[in-house]
Regions:
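Polar, enzyme-active/binding microenvironments
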Residues: 1
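Extended catalytic core of nucleotide-activated donor transferases of GT-like folds
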Residues: 4-128
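A short alpha->loop->secondary-structure connector
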Residues: 129-133
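Short beta-strand->alpha-helix junction loop in the catalytic core
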Residues: 134-139
Length: 139
């Protein structure tokens, strides 16, 4: 299975096991042998390049609202998951148009990956979508 990770991080490629800054998200990319791409590279990736894509929507996302990010992700990946960023309801402090965009984004993905049981319950109730735990991973 070909897996991709998409974030605002400005790097492309797989993460080696000896990476000097193995944060939780990077550890998951390493364990899954996922190829990371920054959002701005999406237009240059071939159609159906990946079986599964995992996305982290950043806290500062105004620029993503301006583009068809979900359309690009669906073009590149057969299935899409979003990995929760921060605590479960941080996005509710955003301007209303960003809140609506975020909920619509959640509704358009196939799977939501959560940090803990509280977040899992919250996102299941909010979206009625499949939600799974993706706990901290240390390598």
């Amino acid at each position: 299975m070909k897996i991709a990770a998409f974030t605002e991080g400005n790097y492309t490629g797989q993460i080696p096991r000896n990476h000097p800054n193995m944060r939780t998200d990077v550890a998951w990319w390493c364990a899954l042998e996922a190829t990371h791409h920054p959002f701005q590279h999406l237009p240059s990736i071939q159609d159906n390049e990946y079986d599964f894509g995992i996305v982290i929507i950043p806290k500062k996302r105004r620029y993503l609202i301006e583009v068809d990010i979900i359309g690009q992700l669906k073009r590149v990946c057969k299935k899409i998951a979003v990995m929760q960023e921060s605590y479960y309801n941080y996005w509710q402090d955003d301007p209303i148009d960003e809140q609506i965009w975020y909920v619509n984004f959640l509704m358009d993905v196939d799977l939501i990956l959560c940090h803990n049981d509280v977040d899992l319950t919250y996102y299941r109730g909010l979206t009625e979508k499949r939600c799974e735990l993706m706990p901290t991973l240390m390598i």
